[in-house]
UniProtKB/Swiss-Prot annotation:
Pathway: Carbohydrate degradation; glycolysis; pyruvate from D-glyceraldehyde 3-phosphate: step 4/5. GO terms for molecular function: phosphopyruvate hydratase activity. Belongs to the enolase family. It is found in: Cytoplasm. Mg(2+) is required for catalysis and for stabilizing the dimer. It catalyses: (2R)-2-phosphoglycerate = phosphoenolpyruvate + H2O. This is Enolase. The keyword Cytoplasm applies. GO terms for biological process: glycolytic process. It comes from Imperata cylindrica (Cogon grass). Homodimer. Keywords: Cytoplasm, Glycolysis, Lyase, Magnesium. Its cofactor is Mg(2+). The keyword Transcription does not apply.
Amino acid sequence: SGETEDVTIADIVVGLRIEEELGDAAVYAGAK
């Protein structure tokens, strides 16, 4: 148990890192 939560947190962290690097591009990619 707890694996799903860990994956979710990891995905959020990766998403934040990508957003910092790509800026608006990450927003558009996330919208699709």
